Amino acid sequence: MFSYFRKSQQKVEENQNGGGGDGRGSGIKVELQTNINSRDLKNEHSDPKFKFSPLRSTDVHLEDYDNEKYKLKFIQIVTRHGRRTPESNRTPLTMWMCNSMDHLISNKDSPRPNCNPGQLTVLGIVDQINVGKIYRKLFIDHLGFLDSQYNKDQIFIRSTNTTRTISSARSLMHGLYGGSFTDEQEKSPHHSSFLVKPDNEENMYPRNSKKLVFLKNLIKQHPKVIKENQLSELEKFTEKINKIFENSKPEESSFRARGFRSYAGLVNSFDCFRNNGLPIPKGLTKDIIQRMYEESAKEFKSARYFPEMSILGIGRFVDDLNKELKLKARNDPSVKDLKLSLYSGHDTTLAALLVGYDMYEDKIHPVTSSTLEFLLMQDKDYKEPEVVKITKSIEKELINHQYVKVIYNHKPIHIGPCKDKEVDGMCPLSEFLKISQSIIPTNYDEQSKLTQLDKKRYLSLIED
Protein backbone atom coordinates (compact mmCIF):
# COMPACT_ATOMS: atom_id res chain seq x y z
CA MET A 1 0.00 0.00 0.00
CA PHE A 2 1.28 3.47 -0.82
CA SER A 3 2.78 5.50 1.98
CA TYR A 4 3.99 8.29 -0.27
CA PHE A 5 1.18 10.77 0.23
CA ARG A 6 -0.61 12.06 3.28
CA LYS A 7 -3.85 13.99 3.26
CA SER A 8 -3.17 17.64 2.71
CA GLN A 9 -4.58 20.64 4.48
CA GLN A 10 -4.88 22.38 1.12
CA LYS A 11 -8.54 22.61 0.15
CA VAL A 12 -10.73 24.30 -2.39
CA GLU A 13 -12.69 26.33 0.14
CA GLU A 14 -16.28 27.42 -0.06
CA ASN A 15 -16.18 31.19 -0.24
CA GLN A 16 -19.19 32.91 1.24
CA ASN A 17 -18.31 36.07 -0.61
CA GLY A 18 -18.33 34.53 -4.07
CA GLY A 19 -16.08 31.51 -4.56
CA GLY A 20 -12.60 32.35 -5.75
CA GLY A 21 -13.21 36.08 -5.62
CA ASP A 22 -14.37 36.42 -9.23
CA GLY A 23 -18.02 37.01 -8.35
CA ARG A 24 -19.25 33.71 -9.77
CA GLY A 25 -20.71 32.27 -6.57
CA SER A 26 -19.52 29.58 -4.20
CA GLY A 27 -16.91 26.97 -4.98
CA ILE A 28 -16.89 23.41 -3.71
CA LYS A 29 -14.67 22.08 -0.96
CA VAL A 30 -12.34 19.27 -2.02
CA GLU A 31 -9.52 17.80 0.02
CA LEU A 32 -6.62 17.20 -2.35
CA GLN A 33 -3.54 15.09 -1.93
CA THR A 34 -0.56 17.40 -2.13
CA ASN A 35 1.87 16.61 0.68
CA ILE A 36 4.87 14.51 -0.26
CA ASN A 37 6.60 12.19 2.15
CA SER A 38 10.08 13.17 0.98
CA ARG A 39 11.72 10.09 2.50
CA ASP A 40 9.70 7.84 0.21
CA LEU A 41 9.41 9.87 -2.97
CA LYS A 42 12.44 12.06 -3.44
CA ASN A 43 15.75 10.62 -4.54
CA GLU A 44 19.25 11.96 -5.11
CA HIS A 45 18.10 13.66 -8.32
CA SER A 46 15.22 15.65 -6.79
CA ASP A 47 15.18 19.37 -6.07
CA PRO A 48 15.06 19.57 -2.24
CA LYS A 49 12.87 22.70 -2.44
CA PHE A 50 10.18 21.06 -4.57
CA LYS A 51 6.64 20.91 -3.19
CA PHE A 52 3.87 19.11 -5.03
CA SER A 53 0.81 21.24 -5.81
CA PRO A 54 -1.88 21.38 -8.53
CA LEU A 55 -0.68 23.02 -11.74
CA ARG A 56 -3.89 24.99 -12.29
CA SER A 57 -7.01 26.18 -10.49
CA THR A 58 -9.13 23.57 -8.75
CA ASP A 59 -11.91 26.04 -7.85
CA VAL A 60 -15.22 24.76 -9.25
CA HIS A 61 -18.37 26.92 -9.31
CA LEU A 62 -21.66 25.06 -8.88
CA GLU A 63 -23.77 27.60 -10.76
CA ASP A 64 -21.83 26.79 -13.94
CA TYR A 65 -23.45 23.36 -13.88
CA ASP A 66 -26.86 23.92 -12.32
CA ASN A 67 -28.88 27.05 -11.58
CA GLU A 68 -32.47 28.25 -11.41
CA LYS A 69 -32.83 28.51 -15.21
CA TYR A 70 -30.85 25.58 -16.65
CA LYS A 71 -30.08 21.97 -15.78
CA LEU A 72 -27.17 19.77 -16.84
CA LYS A 73 -28.25 17.05 -19.25
CA PHE A 74 -24.92 15.61 -20.42
CA ILE A 75 -21.20 16.39 -20.26
CA GLN A 76 -18.20 15.54 -22.41
CA ILE A 77 -14.82 15.92 -20.68
CA VAL A 78 -11.63 15.97 -22.75
CA THR A 79 -8.49 15.75 -20.64
CA ARG A 80 -4.77 16.03 -21.01
CA HIS A 81 -2.80 13.29 -19.27
CA GLY A 82 -0.94 13.86 -15.99
CA ARG A 83 2.76 14.56 -15.44
CA ARG A 84 5.00 12.19 -17.34
CA THR A 85 8.56 11.20 -18.13
CA PRO A 86 10.35 12.46 -21.28
CA GLU A 87 9.61 10.61 -24.50
CA SER A 88 13.31 10.30 -25.27
CA ASN A 89 15.83 8.34 -23.22
CA ARG A 90 18.62 10.88 -23.47
CA THR A 91 18.28 11.34 -19.71
CA PRO A 92 18.32 8.25 -17.45
CA LEU A 93 14.70 7.43 -16.65
CA THR A 94 15.73 6.26 -13.18
CA MET A 95 15.43 9.94 -12.22
CA TRP A 96 11.62 9.66 -12.27
CA MET A 97 9.24 7.66 -10.06
CA CYS A 98 6.67 5.42 -11.79
CA ASN A 99 4.37 2.49 -11.11
CA SER A 100 3.62 -0.48 -13.31
CA MET A 101 0.33 -0.61 -15.19
CA ASP A 102 -0.66 -3.69 -13.16
CA HIS A 103 -0.24 -1.86 -9.86
CA LEU A 104 -1.05 1.64 -11.02
CA ILE A 105 -3.08 2.82 -8.03
CA SER A 106 -1.94 0.59 -5.17
CA ASN A 107 1.81 0.09 -5.19
CA LYS A 108 2.65 -3.60 -4.92
CA ASP A 109 5.74 -3.44 -7.09
CA SER A 110 8.87 -4.61 -5.35
CA PRO A 111 11.33 -3.39 -6.35
CA ARG A 112 9.89 -0.26 -7.99
CA PRO A 113 9.95 -0.65 -11.79
CA ASN A 114 11.99 1.57 -14.06
CA CYS A 115 10.03 4.23 -15.90
CA ASN A 116 9.44 4.00 -19.63
CA PRO A 117 9.65 6.94 -22.06
CA GLY A 118 6.50 9.06 -21.92
CA GLN A 119 5.03 7.17 -18.96
CA LEU A 120 2.78 8.74 -16.32
CA THR A 121 4.75 9.39 -13.12
CA VAL A 122 3.55 8.88 -9.56
CA LEU A 123 2.79 12.61 -9.40
CA GLY A 124 0.88 12.35 -12.67
CA ILE A 125 -1.29 9.63 -11.15
CA VAL A 126 -2.04 11.85 -8.14
CA ASP A 127 -2.87 14.76 -10.47
CA GLN A 128 -5.53 12.71 -12.20
CA ILE A 129 -6.90 11.24 -8.96
CA ASN A 130 -7.34 14.80 -7.69
CA VAL A 131 -9.23 15.74 -10.87
CA GLY A 132 -11.49 12.74 -10.31
CA LYS A 133 -12.05 13.70 -6.66
CA ILE A 134 -13.14 17.18 -7.73
CA TYR A 135 -15.64 15.68 -10.17
CA ARG A 136 -16.91 13.32 -7.47
CA LYS A 137 -17.67 16.26 -5.20
CA LEU A 138 -19.36 18.05 -8.08
CA PHE A 139 -21.32 15.37 -9.94
CA ILE A 140 -22.09 12.96 -7.08
CA ASP A 141 -21.99 14.79 -3.75
CA HIS A 142 -23.38 18.19 -4.80
CA LEU A 143 -25.46 17.66 -7.94
CA GLY A 144 -26.47 14.00 -7.62
CA PHE A 145 -25.92 13.86 -11.38
CA LEU A 146 -24.08 10.51 -11.30
CA ASP A 147 -24.76 7.42 -9.21
CA SER A 148 -22.53 7.10 -6.16
CA GLN A 149 -21.38 3.68 -7.40
CA TYR A 150 -19.86 3.21 -10.83
CA ASN A 151 -22.55 2.56 -13.45
CA LYS A 152 -21.12 1.57 -16.82
CA ASP A 153 -24.31 2.75 -18.57
CA GLN A 154 -23.82 6.30 -17.27
CA ILE A 155 -20.18 6.74 -18.28
CA PHE A 156 -18.35 6.24 -21.57
CA ILE A 157 -14.54 6.27 -21.53
CA ARG A 158 -12.21 6.58 -24.50
CA SER A 159 -8.44 6.96 -24.52
CA THR A 160 -5.72 7.24 -27.11
CA ASN A 161 -3.52 4.16 -27.30
CA THR A 162 -0.69 5.33 -25.04
CA THR A 163 0.08 4.14 -21.53
CA ARG A 164 0.01 7.68 -20.11
CA THR A 165 -3.50 8.46 -21.39
CA ILE A 166 -4.86 5.05 -20.37
CA SER A 167 -3.23 5.45 -16.94
CA SER A 168 -4.64 8.98 -16.68
CA ALA A 169 -8.18 7.78 -17.40
CA ARG A 170 -7.87 4.99 -14.84
CA SER A 171 -6.49 7.40 -12.23
CA LEU A 172 -9.22 9.97 -12.83
CA MET A 173 -11.89 7.29 -12.55
CA HIS A 174 -10.29 6.07 -9.33
CA GLY A 175 -10.61 9.58 -7.92
CA LEU A 176 -14.23 9.68 -9.08
CA TYR A 177 -15.22 6.30 -7.65
CA GLY A 178 -12.29 5.22 -5.49
CA GLY A 179 -10.81 7.29 -2.72
CA SER A 180 -7.24 8.23 -2.02
CA PHE A 181 -4.00 7.14 -3.62
CA THR A 182 -3.34 4.90 -0.62
CA ASP A 183 -6.30 2.61 -1.35
CA GLU A 184 -5.24 -1.00 -1.85
CA GLN A 185 -8.39 -1.70 -3.84
CA GLU A 186 -8.55 0.04 -7.20
CA LYS A 187 -12.18 1.01 -7.63
CA SER A 188 -12.03 2.50 -11.10
CA PRO A 189 -13.03 0.46 -14.16
CA HIS A 190 -10.16 -1.50 -15.65
CA HIS A 191 -8.71 -0.04 -18.84
CA SER A 192 -10.01 -3.00 -20.86
CA SER A 193 -13.45 -1.40 -20.53
CA PHE A 194 -12.25 1.76 -22.32
CA LEU A 195 -12.61 2.37 -26.03
CA VAL A 196 -9.13 2.54 -27.55
CA LYS A 197 -9.18 2.89 -31.33
CA PRO A 198 -6.52 1.25 -33.52
CA ASP A 199 -3.80 3.61 -34.64
CA ASN A 200 -5.09 3.94 -38.21
CA GLU A 201 -8.48 5.12 -36.88
CA GLU A 202 -7.28 7.40 -34.06
CA ASN A 203 -8.40 11.01 -34.47
CA MET A 204 -8.07 12.54 -31.00
CA TYR A 205 -4.95 14.43 -32.00
CA PRO A 206 -3.65 15.81 -35.33
CA ARG A 207 -2.34 13.10 -37.65
CA ASN A 208 0.36 13.93 -40.16
CA SER A 209 -1.33 13.91 -43.55
CA LYS A 210 0.68 15.38 -46.43
CA LYS A 211 -1.34 18.59 -46.50
CA LEU A 212 -1.25 19.11 -42.73
CA VAL A 213 2.53 18.61 -42.58
CA PHE A 214 2.95 21.09 -45.43
CA LEU A 215 0.77 23.68 -43.68
CA LYS A 216 2.53 23.18 -40.33
CA ASN A 217 5.83 24.07 -41.98
CA LEU A 218 4.36 26.87 -44.05
CA ILE A 219 2.63 28.59 -41.14
CA LYS A 220 6.01 29.71 -39.83
CA GLN A 221 6.37 31.81 -42.98
CA HIS A 222 2.95 33.41 -42.70
CA PRO A 223 3.31 37.24 -42.70
CA LYS A 224 1.23 37.61 -39.53
CA VAL A 225 3.35 35.06 -37.68
CA ILE A 226 6.58 36.69 -38.86
CA LYS A 227 5.36 40.16 -37.85
CA GLU A 228 4.23 38.98 -34.42
CA ASN A 229 7.57 37.28 -33.79
CA GLN A 230 9.47 40.38 -34.89
CA LEU A 231 7.46 42.67 -32.62
CA SER A 232 8.04 40.38 -29.64
CA GLU A 233 11.74 39.92 -30.52
CA LEU A 234 11.29 36.16 -30.39
CA GLU A 235 14.63 35.45 -32.04
CA LYS A 236 16.47 37.30 -29.29
CA PHE A 237 14.46 35.46 -26.62
CA THR A 238 15.24 32.09 -28.22
CA GLU A 239 18.95 32.91 -28.29
CA LYS A 240 18.75 33.79 -24.60
CA ILE A 241 17.26 30.39 -23.74
CA ASN A 242 19.81 28.52 -25.84
CA LYS A 243 22.57 30.44 -24.04
CA ILE A 244 21.13 29.33 -20.68
CA PHE A 245 21.29 25.70 -21.80
CA GLU A 246 24.82 26.20 -23.10
CA ASN A 247 26.01 27.62 -19.78
CA SER A 248 24.12 25.17 -17.56
CA LYS A 249 26.34 22.68 -15.75
CA PRO A 250 25.48 18.95 -15.66
CA GLU A 251 25.60 18.89 -11.86
CA GLU A 252 23.09 21.77 -11.78
CA SER A 253 20.44 20.16 -14.02
CA SER A 254 20.15 17.30 -16.49
CA PHE A 255 17.60 19.21 -18.56
CA ARG A 256 18.99 20.15 -21.97
CA ALA A 257 17.08 21.41 -24.99
CA ARG A 258 19.62 23.53 -26.86
CA GLY A 259 18.58 24.01 -30.47
CA PHE A 260 14.94 23.09 -29.74
CA ARG A 261 12.66 23.21 -32.80
CA SER A 262 9.42 24.42 -31.22
CA TYR A 263 8.24 25.99 -28.00
CA ALA A 264 5.55 23.33 -27.64
CA GLY A 265 8.26 20.68 -27.64
CA LEU A 266 10.42 22.72 -25.27
CA VAL A 267 7.59 23.18 -22.77
CA ASN A 268 6.68 19.49 -22.86
CA SER A 269 10.28 18.49 -22.12
CA PHE A 270 10.64 21.18 -19.47
CA ASP A 271 7.46 20.02 -17.70
CA CYS A 272 8.87 16.52 -17.33
CA PHE A 273 11.62 17.95 -15.13
CA ARG A 274 10.17 20.94 -13.30
CA ASN A 275 6.73 19.43 -12.57
CA ASN A 276 8.21 16.17 -11.29
CA GLY A 277 10.53 17.87 -8.82
CA LEU A 278 13.76 17.64 -10.81
CA PRO A 279 16.18 20.59 -10.98
CA ILE A 280 16.12 22.98 -13.95
CA PRO A 281 18.89 25.33 -15.16
CA LYS A 282 19.21 28.33 -12.83
CA GLY A 283 18.88 30.84 -15.65
CA LEU A 284 15.29 29.80 -16.34
CA THR A 285 13.54 32.44 -14.23
CA LYS A 286 9.78 32.67 -13.61
CA ASP A 287 9.44 35.34 -16.29
CA ILE A 288 11.32 33.26 -18.85
CA ILE A 289 9.27 30.16 -18.03
CA GLN A 290 6.03 32.12 -18.33
CA ARG A 291 7.02 33.38 -21.75
CA MET A 292 8.00 29.87 -22.87
CA TYR A 293 4.43 28.78 -22.13
CA GLU A 294 3.04 31.82 -23.94
CA GLU A 295 5.17 31.22 -27.03
CA SER A 296 3.97 27.62 -27.14
CA ALA A 297 0.35 28.83 -27.03
CA LYS A 298 1.12 31.25 -29.87
CA GLU A 299 2.42 28.34 -31.95
CA PHE A 300 -0.83 26.46 -31.41
CA LYS A 301 -2.94 29.55 -32.12
CA SER A 302 -1.15 30.26 -35.42
CA ALA A 303 -3.15 27.39 -36.94
CA ARG A 304 -6.09 29.80 -37.20
CA TYR A 305 -4.43 31.40 -40.23
CA PHE A 306 -5.07 28.18 -42.18
CA PRO A 307 -8.55 26.86 -41.20
CA GLU A 308 -7.73 23.61 -43.01
CA MET A 309 -5.33 22.80 -40.17
CA SER A 310 -8.24 22.50 -37.74
CA ILE A 311 -10.35 20.56 -40.22
CA LEU A 312 -7.59 18.03 -40.89
CA GLY A 313 -6.11 18.08 -37.40
CA ILE A 314 -9.13 17.65 -35.13
CA GLY A 315 -12.22 17.72 -37.36
CA ARG A 316 -12.88 13.98 -37.28
CA PHE A 317 -12.81 13.97 -33.48
CA VAL A 318 -15.19 16.94 -33.47
CA ASP A 319 -17.48 14.80 -35.62
CA ASP A 320 -17.34 11.99 -33.03
CA LEU A 321 -18.15 14.42 -30.22
CA ASN A 322 -21.00 16.02 -32.14
CA LYS A 323 -22.65 12.76 -33.14
CA GLU A 324 -22.71 11.71 -29.50
CA LEU A 325 -23.95 15.12 -28.37
CA LYS A 326 -26.76 15.14 -30.92
CA LEU A 327 -27.89 11.63 -29.94
CA LYS A 328 -28.17 12.80 -26.35
CA ALA A 329 -29.91 16.02 -27.32
CA ARG A 330 -32.62 14.18 -29.24
CA ASN A 331 -33.08 11.55 -26.50
CA ASP A 332 -31.95 8.65 -28.65
CA PRO A 333 -32.55 5.31 -26.84
CA SER A 334 -28.93 4.24 -27.49
CA VAL A 335 -27.70 6.89 -25.02
CA LYS A 336 -30.69 6.89 -22.69
CA ASP A 337 -28.66 6.45 -19.49
CA LEU A 338 -25.42 8.09 -20.66
CA LYS A 339 -24.49 11.15 -18.60
CA LEU A 340 -20.73 11.60 -18.91
CA SER A 341 -18.19 10.84 -21.62
CA LEU A 342 -14.50 11.00 -20.73
CA TYR A 343 -11.89 11.38 -23.47
CA SER A 344 -8.29 10.97 -22.30
CA GLY A 345 -5.96 12.75 -24.70
CA HIS A 346 -3.02 15.08 -25.08
CA ASP A 347 -2.06 18.76 -25.11
CA THR A 348 -2.48 18.70 -28.88
CA THR A 349 -6.05 17.41 -28.42
CA LEU A 350 -7.03 20.33 -26.21
CA ALA A 351 -5.12 22.97 -28.15
CA ALA A 352 -6.63 21.85 -31.47
CA LEU A 353 -10.17 22.01 -30.04
CA LEU A 354 -9.53 25.42 -28.49
CA VAL A 355 -8.20 26.77 -31.79
CA GLY A 356 -10.83 25.05 -33.96
CA TYR A 357 -13.70 26.66 -32.05
CA ASP A 358 -11.80 29.97 -31.71
CA MET A 359 -11.99 29.80 -27.91
CA TYR A 360 -8.30 29.67 -26.96
CA GLU A 361 -8.62 32.49 -24.43
CA ASP A 362 -5.79 31.27 -22.20
CA LYS A 363 -2.32 32.64 -22.86
CA ILE A 364 -0.36 29.49 -22.12
CA HIS A 365 0.26 25.93 -23.29
CA PRO A 366 -2.35 23.47 -21.84
CA VAL A 367 -0.79 22.20 -18.62
CA THR A 368 -0.86 18.52 -17.67
CA SER A 369 -4.20 17.34 -16.23
CA SER A 370 -6.08 20.14 -17.98
CA THR A 371 -9.76 19.54 -18.67
CA LEU A 372 -12.01 20.86 -21.42
CA GLU A 373 -15.73 20.34 -20.76
CA PHE A 374 -18.64 20.55 -23.19
CA LEU A 375 -21.80 20.85 -21.08
CA LEU A 376 -25.18 20.17 -22.67
CA MET A 377 -27.63 22.35 -20.75
CA GLN A 378 -31.42 22.45 -21.05
CA ASP A 379 -34.09 24.94 -20.00
CA LYS A 380 -35.35 23.84 -16.58
CA ASP A 381 -38.93 24.89 -17.22
CA TYR A 382 -39.13 23.01 -20.53
CA LYS A 383 -41.23 19.85 -20.46
CA GLU A 384 -39.98 17.33 -22.99
CA PRO A 385 -42.68 15.74 -25.16
CA GLU A 386 -43.55 12.17 -24.20
CA VAL A 387 -43.30 10.40 -27.53
CA VAL A 388 -42.09 7.02 -28.74
CA LYS A 389 -40.60 8.26 -32.00
CA ILE A 390 -38.56 11.43 -32.37
CA THR A 391 -39.66 13.21 -35.54
CA LYS A 392 -37.69 16.00 -37.23
CA SER A 393 -40.02 18.63 -35.77
CA ILE A 394 -39.69 17.23 -32.23
CA GLU A 395 -35.91 17.01 -32.64
CA LYS A 396 -35.84 20.67 -33.65
CA GLU A 397 -37.98 21.58 -30.65
CA LEU A 398 -35.67 19.68 -28.30
CA ILE A 399 -32.57 21.29 -29.78
CA ASN A 400 -34.10 24.77 -29.47
CA HIS A 401 -34.26 24.32 -25.69
CA GLN A 402 -30.65 23.20 -25.31
CA TYR A 403 -27.31 24.98 -25.14
CA VAL A 404 -23.61 24.20 -24.99
CA LYS A 405 -21.46 25.72 -22.29
CA VAL A 406 -17.69 25.24 -22.52
CA ILE A 407 -15.51 25.16 -19.41
CA TYR A 408 -11.71 24.99 -19.54
CA ASN A 409 -9.91 24.19 -16.30
CA HIS A 410 -13.05 25.13 -14.33
CA LYS A 411 -13.45 28.51 -16.02
CA PRO A 412 -16.17 29.23 -18.64
CA ILE A 413 -14.82 30.16 -22.07
CA HIS A 414 -16.64 31.32 -25.19
CA ILE A 415 -16.83 30.02 -28.75
CA GLY A 416 -15.67 32.81 -31.07
CA PRO A 417 -18.30 32.53 -33.84
CA CYS A 418 -21.09 32.19 -31.25
CA LYS A 419 -20.32 35.17 -29.01
CA ASP A 420 -22.99 37.42 -30.54
CA LYS A 421 -25.60 34.63 -30.31
CA GLU A 422 -24.95 33.54 -26.73
CA VAL A 423 -27.72 33.02 -24.21
CA ASP A 424 -26.51 33.54 -20.63
CA GLY A 425 -22.94 32.80 -21.71
CA MET A 426 -23.90 29.64 -23.60
CA CYS A 427 -24.02 28.79 -27.30
CA PRO A 428 -27.47 27.64 -28.50
CA LEU A 429 -27.11 24.00 -29.51
CA SER A 430 -28.35 24.68 -33.05
CA GLU A 431 -25.59 27.27 -33.52
CA PHE A 432 -22.99 25.03 -31.92
CA LEU A 433 -23.80 22.22 -34.35
CA LYS A 434 -23.51 24.63 -37.31
CA ILE A 435 -20.13 25.90 -36.12
CA SER A 436 -18.95 22.34 -35.58
CA GLN A 437 -19.85 21.44 -39.16
CA SER A 438 -17.40 24.07 -40.39
CA ILE A 439 -14.59 22.17 -38.62
CA ILE A 440 -15.60 18.66 -39.70
CA PRO A 441 -14.05 17.36 -42.97
CA THR A 442 -16.50 16.33 -45.69
CA ASN A 443 -14.04 13.79 -47.10
CA TYR A 444 -10.92 13.46 -44.95
CA ASP A 445 -8.91 11.29 -47.36
CA GLU A 446 -9.48 13.62 -50.29
CA GLN A 447 -8.96 16.79 -48.26
CA SER A 448 -5.69 15.40 -46.87
CA LYS A 449 -4.12 15.11 -50.32
CA LEU A 450 -1.64 17.75 -51.42
CA THR A 451 -1.43 18.64 -55.09
CA GLN A 452 0.93 21.01 -56.85
CA LEU A 453 -2.00 23.38 -57.32
CA ASP A 454 -2.59 23.31 -53.57
CA LYS A 455 1.04 24.20 -52.92
CA LYS A 456 0.90 27.15 -55.33
CA ARG A 457 -2.35 28.39 -53.80
CA TYR A 458 -1.03 28.29 -50.24
CA LEU A 459 2.27 29.87 -51.21
CA SER A 460 0.41 32.69 -52.93
CA LEU A 461 -1.60 33.30 -49.75
CA ILE A 462 1.51 33.98 -47.67
CA GLU A 463 3.06 36.13 -50.41
CA ASP A 464 0.09 38.48 -50.70
UniProtKB/Swiss-Prot annotation:
Entries under PROSITE patterns matching the protein: HIS_ACID_PHOSPHAT_1 (PS00616)
Catalyzed reactions: a phosphate monoester + H2O = an alcohol + phosphate
Coiled-coil residues: none
Region (Disordered): 1-29, 180-202
GO molecular function, one term: acid phosphatase activity
InterPro entries: Acid_Pase_AS, His_Pase_clade-2, His_PPase_superfam, Histidine_acid_phosphatase
Compositional bias annotation for Gly residues: 17-26
Record keywords: Hydrolase
Residues at the active site: H81 (nucleophile), D347 (proton donor)
Pfam families for this protein: His_Phos_2
EC annotation from Swiss-Prot or TrEMBL: 3.1.3.2
Transmembrane segments: none
Family assignment from sequence similarity: Belongs to the histidine acid phosphatase family.
The protein, known as: Probable acid phosphatase DDB_G0284753
Organism: Dictyostelium discoideum (Social amoeba)
